[in-house]
Amino acid sequence: MSSTGENKNQIKIKFFTNEEDESLQVADTPLYVPVTLKRFGLSEVVNHLLGNFKGEDETKAPIPFDFLIDGVLLRTSIEDYLTKNGLSNEAFLTLEYTRAILPPSFLASFNNDDWISSIDSINPTTKIVMSSQLSISQPKILSGSYDGIVRTYNMSGKVEKQYVGHSAPVKAVKWISPTRIVSAGNDRQVRLWKTSYEEIIDEDEEEIEDGKTLALLEGHKAPVVDLAVDTQTNRILSAGYDQNIGFWSTNYKEMTSIQPLEYDSNVVSSSSKKRRKMAVQDATIRRRAPLSLLQGHSEPVEGVIFDAKDSTVGYSVSQDHTIKTWDLVTSRCVDTRTTGYSLLSVLQLPQVNLIASGSSARHINLHDPRVTTTSDQTISKLVGHTNFVVGLTASPHNQNMFASSSHDGTVKVWDVRAEKSLYTITRQDGSTNAKIFDVCWDDRIGIISGGEDKKLQINKGSDIAK
C-alpha cells in the first residue's frame, strides 16, 4: 500500500550514451529511481546495469560517469533539477551519461628563471608533428619568459634548447614544427627560429643548444602579445598593441625583404649593454615585411586565432571591447561583435561552433560566430574567476571542454554544458597569490600553466576529459 508514497519520491528515467565504446551501452528500458539521486548515485545505477562491480577483475571495475539532461550537465540532485525547471516527479527524464571528468591532480613543476608569459607544447601525435614528416619520441614544452628568453623543456624538466634574441619580455610562443618556432614580445619583434633536428637527446649533455634566428618579422610599432599558427597554409597571425594584426608566412622566402631602417628606434629604449649587443647581432639577420597588416581595432589587440575549419578566416579580440572576424584573403573585417569590457584572450571550440573570449570583467563569453550579429550576441557567460581571464586552451579529448588561466592565480576547467567550472587548479602549495599568465592543455602531458611564480606546473587526471 505504500507504493504511492514511494512513487512520490521516485521518477521515471531512461539512460542513453553517445560513447563509442559498445561495452558502455545499456538498454534504453525505462526505470524508476529516487529523486534524491545525484551524480554518484546515478553512476552506481549505470554501473549496476553494466555489471561493473568492485572486485579483482579490473576490466569490470566501476566507471565514474557524468549525466546530462537536455544537454546540460547535472550538478545537483534530480529533485533540485525538477524544482529549478518547474517540473514534477511525474515527468519522464532522458539522461545522457558520459565518462566523468576526474580532478586534475598535481604531477610536476619545472623551474624557470623569470615570469612565464606564454606556453605551447608538442607530442608525437600532435598535428604539427604529424604534418611535418619529422618524428619525436617525447613530448616537449615551449615557454616564453619575461627575461626575453624562449626555452624548450623535456619531460624531466630539463631545458633542452634556448632561443636568445629578444631584448624585452617575450609575450607569445608557438611551435611551427619540431625544428621551427615563432615568438613575439615587447620589443615589437616577431622572430622565426630554427634548431637542429635531434630525435634522440643526450640526457648527459650539459650544454644547452641555442636556437638560431631565421628571420625578424617587422611591421608592428608596439609590443606583440599573441600569436597563432596555421600549419595547413603556413601562415601566422600576430596581435599588436599598435592596434594592428600582422599576417605572415612561416617561410621567410614568401615575404618581402626589408632593410634595417632606423633599427635602433625599433628596440625598446635603453642604454643596457644587453640591448645594444642584441641590436648589433641582429644587424646581420634577414628581415621580412608582413604579407598584410589587418587594421580596424581602436585599442591594443590581445588575442588572435585562425578558424579551425577555414584557414582563410581569423578572429581577434581587443581592449576596444570587440571580437572581430577577418577575411584573410582580402584583409578585411567581415564581422564585429561588441561587448562592454576589454577582451584579453580568445579560443575556438569548432565542434560545438563556439568562440570563447576571456574578459577584464572576470568572466568568459561564449558565442556562435555563425549567428548574425544582434544586440544580444552572447550565448552565455561563464562566471567563476575573480580577476582578468588571460589564457584559454581547448581540451584535446572533449569538444565541450577547455581550461582558462587568470590573474586570480588559478586555472579553471570548464564544460560549456555546465554553468560553473568543473575544477579549480591552484599552485602546488595551494597559493593563489601569483598571476597565471598562460595555460596549455596537451593530450599527453596534461594541463600546463605558468606565470609570476616562475614555474611550469603540470596537472593531470587519469581519465580527465576522456
Swiss-Prot record:
SMART domains: WD40. It is found in: Nucleus, Nucleolus; Nucleus, Nucleoplasm. PANTHER family: RIBOSOME BIOGENESIS PROTEIN WDR12, WD40 REPEAT PROTEIN 12, 37. The lineage of its organism: Eukaryota, Fungi, Dikarya, Ascomycota, Saccharomycotina. CDD domains: WD40 (cd00200). Belongs to the WD repeat WDR12/YTM1 family. InterPro entries: G-protein_beta_WD-40_rep, NLE, WD40/YVTN_repeat-like_dom_sf, WD40_repeat_dom_sf, WD40_rpt, WDR12/Ytm1. GO terms for cellular component: nucleoplasm; PeBoW complex; preribosome, large subunit precursor. One of its GO terms (biological process) is maturation of LSU-rRNA from tricistronic rRNA transcript (SSU-rRNA, 5.8S rRNA, LSU-rRNA). Residues 11-99 are annotated as: Ubiquitin-like (UBL) domain. This is Ribosome biogenesis protein YTM1. It holds the Pfam family WD40. Its main location: nucleus. WD repeats lie at residues 124-163, 165-203, 219-258, 296-336, 338-377, 384-424, 431-466. GO terms for molecular function: ribonucleoprotein complex binding. Residues 109-466 are annotated as: Sufficient for interaction with ERB1 and association with 66S pre-ribosomes. Component of the NOP7 complex, composed of ERB1, NOP7 and YTM1. The complex is held together by ERB1, which interacts with NOP7 via its N-terminal domain and with YTM1 via a high-affinity interaction between the seven-bladed beta-propeller domains of the 2 proteins. The NOP7 complex associates with the 66S pre-ribosome. Interacts (via UBL domain) with MDN1 (via VWFA/MIDAS domain). Component of the NOP7 complex, which is required for maturation of the 25S and 5.8S ribosomal RNAs and formation of the 60S ribosome.
